[in-house]
Amino acid sequence: MSRLLLTLAITTTVGSLLSSNPAAAQVLPPAKRAERVEITKGPELELATDHLTIIRWTTNNPGGSDVHYGIVHYGTDRKDLNQTAKSPIRLNQGHPYTMFRVRMERLKPRTIYYYRVASEESNGKSDGVKSSVNTFTTPGPGERIVAYPKRD
C-alpha cells in the first residue's frame, strides 16, 4: 500500500511539473519602440587601461527587436573614426531605457582617442541615434582609470 502511495505521489508531482501553466507559457509582446530615440545619459568612460576602454551610455528606447547592439566608432583622428567596436545587449522589456556598454581593445597607451556612439537593432536597422564626437586618453602601462561607479 505504501509503495502505491509513493508511486501515486511521484506521478502527481511529475505530472504537475510537466503540465503547462497558461500564465507561465505566455510570452510578452515586444515593447514599443520609442518614437524618437535619444541618448539620455553619457556617453561616458567606465574603465580605461593602457590597452582597453569601456564606454557606457543610456537611451530612452526599451523596444524594437529583443537584441540591440551598442556601437562605438573610434580612432586617433577626430575626422577619421576608422575602427569599430560592437557589443550585443538583450533588452529588458520591463525597463523604459536601455544601457549600453562597449569594450574597445588593443588600444595604445597614453594615446588620445576620439569616438562616437550609436545603436542598432539586431537586423542592422539604426535606432537613429548618434552622439557627438567625444574623447578619452588611455593611461600609461600598468595604470587604470575607473570612472564608474563614481566615487565621492
Walk through the language-model features, giving the residues of each.
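A generic membrane alpha-helix/interface feature
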Residues: 1, 20-21, 129
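Bacterial N-terminal signal peptides that target proteins for export
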Residues: 1-9
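C-terminal segment of classical bacterial N-terminal signal peptides
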Residues: 14-22
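Short, surface-exposed linear motifs at loops/turns and structural transition points
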Residues: 26-152
